Curated annotation (Swiss-Prot):
It is found in: Cytoplasm; Cell membrane. GO terms for cellular component: cytoplasm; cytosol; nucleoplasm; plasma membrane. Signal peptide: none annotated. The keyword Cytoplasm applies. Pfam families: DUF758. Changing L60W: Reduces binding to phosphoinositide. Keywords: Cell membrane, Cytoplasm, Lipid transport, Membrane, Transport. This is Tumor necrosis factor alpha-induced protein 8-like protein 3. Widely expressed (at protein level). Belongs to the TNFAIP8 family. Its main location: cytoplasm.
Length: 204
């Protein structure tokens, strides 16, 4: 079902958009339409990343741009993250996963839940932040995602998975995000508020 080969180049309109006009919601809609136009079933045409997740992605974009000093790279990372999330969502909703893969889905859910709670705890409890702990959890999530989509998606999408998780699991990026006196504290606050909402709503 993977349709990477027919995509536009990364220089498509919108790539150079600034942090105040970047919208993960719009990017998700564009990616979704492109992916859905190339698969037989249209039953997931109403699938969108929810508003809370969209807000988290937007804040991650801003922090990524601050960390990389590269608007285009920040956009590409978030675009890859959204594409991967949508493709996995399509596979799941269309019941494309085998029984063995459904077990991996549950492992991934638990690992994402653990990672989310750890992220919030590190923000809420002073002096507990440990880059290595959070980086390890994110790499474990990455390995489970690779295992889950192994027989469904192309090497190009596996490359996207690496691109996304290697960035967010990078200890220097995590230090930028959690820096107690850095510019990203307001972003981290909004990210953790969003994560808490997803946890309360049993989405994570």
């Amino acid at each position: 079902m993977d349709s990477d080969s027919g995509e536009q180049s990364e220089g498509e309109p919108g790539t150079a958009a600034g942090p105040h006009v970047f919208s993960s919601k719009n990017l998700a809609l564009q990616a979704q339409k492109k992916i859905l136009s190339k698969i037989a079933s249209k039953t997931v045409a109403n699938m969108l990343i929810d508003d809370t997740s969209s807000e988290i992605f937007d804040e991650l974009y801003k922090v990524t741009e601050i960390h990389t000093h590269n608007k285009k790279e920040a956009h590409k990372i978030m675009k890859d993250a959204i594409k991967v999330a949508i493709k996995i969502g399509i596979l799941y909703r269309n019941k494309q996963f085998s029984q063995e893969e459904v077990i991996i889905v549950e492992k991934l859910r638990k690992k994402l839940n653990q990672t989310a709670m750890t992220m919030v705890s590190f923000y809420e409890v002073e002096y507990t932040f440990d880059t290595n702990v959070l980086s390890k959890l994110l790499h474990e999530c990455k390995d489970l995602v690779h295992e889950l989509v192994q027989r469904h998606l192309t090497p190009r999408t596996h490359g996207r998975i690496n691109h996304v998780f290697n960035h967010f699991a990078d200890v220097e990026f995590l230090s930028t995000l959690y820096g107690p006196h850095g510019n990203c504290r307001p972003n981290l606050k909004r990210i953790c508020e969003g994560i808490n909402k997803l946890l309360d709503d049993k989405i994570l």
